[in-house]
Amino acid sequence: MDVTNVLLKPVLTEKVYFNQMGETKKYVFVVNPKASKTRVKLAFELVYGIKPLKVNTLIRKPTTIRGGSRFPGLSKLEKLAVITLPKGIAISVTGEAPEKTDKPADKTTLKESTVKEIKDTKNSPEAVVKTAVEALQIKPTAAPVTTAPLQTVAVKVAKEVKEVKVEKPVKVEKPTKPAKVAKEAKTTKVAKETKAEKSVQTTKVAKETKTEKSAKTTKTTATKTTKTKTTKKEVKK
């Protein structure tokens, strides 16, 4: 069996990380199921260059897996090797690159060459200031703009405001349209006609009700008289 086919992949779990907190650190690898402990030791020495203190092997049996179909599946059979290292020795299993601790230099710091030039030069102080400004990359500020005093500006503005006169807008009454006037006259006429018709109808109904009531009263009186006459005839007999 080739040594390269013994250590397949590392196992990275919380339990493994917890075992790596102490002085004696333990690492777990998925191993070829046909490999023995001696094979695992040799493979580890060739890959990492460290002799392990102890090697223990475990067999992880297949378990049922519920997949997308209704029939459950099974996981693969795996053989694990727990390798313990001597005290004070550790390895990087993940293969991650170490973090960079170098910080970028500040922009305001001077370069070493410019500082030496400033110290060595025996010229006037103006040249020294120029070299320092170029090293710091400072842009010179613009010259201040000369402005007139505030009092004179305020007087000018006040004069201009007095001279300017704002004319108020005059309200213009809009002429009424003849169509609207005609519509209003029609509506008033219709209202008057409807009121007159309603009054005539109410008077007619009142008269009819009075005549009907008088006719009913006459009928009732006539029936009463006939009844009295018949009763008198019966008594005489």
Swiss-Prot record:
GO terms for molecular function: rRNA binding; structural constituent of ribosome. It comes from the Bacteria. Residues 174-237 are annotated as: Disordered. InterPro entries: Nucleotide-bd_a/b_plait_sf (IPR012677), Ribosomal_uL23-like (IPR013025), Ribosomal_uL23/eL15/eS24_sf (IPR012678). SUPFAM superfamilies: Ribosomal proteins S24e, L23 and L15e. Residues 128-237 are annotated as: Unknown. One of its GO terms (biological process) is translation. Residues 1-127 are annotated as: Large ribosomal subunit protein uL23. Keywords: Ribonucleoprotein, Ribosomal protein, RNA-binding, rRNA-binding. One of its GO terms (cellular component) is ribosome. It holds the Pfam family Ribosomal_L23. The keyword Acyltransferase does not apply. Residues 174-198, 205-215 have a biased composition (Basic and acidic residues). One of the early assembly proteins it binds 23S rRNA. One of the proteins that surrounds the polypeptide exit tunnel on the outside of the ribosome. Forms the main docking site for trigger factor binding to the ribosome. Part of the 50S ribosomal subunit. Contacts protein L29, and trigger factor when it is bound to the ribosome. Belongs to the universal ribosomal protein uL23 family. This is Large ribosomal subunit protein uL23. It comes from Mycoplasma pneumoniae (strain ATCC 29342 / M129 / Subtype 1) (Mycoplasmoides pneumoniae). The gene is rplW.
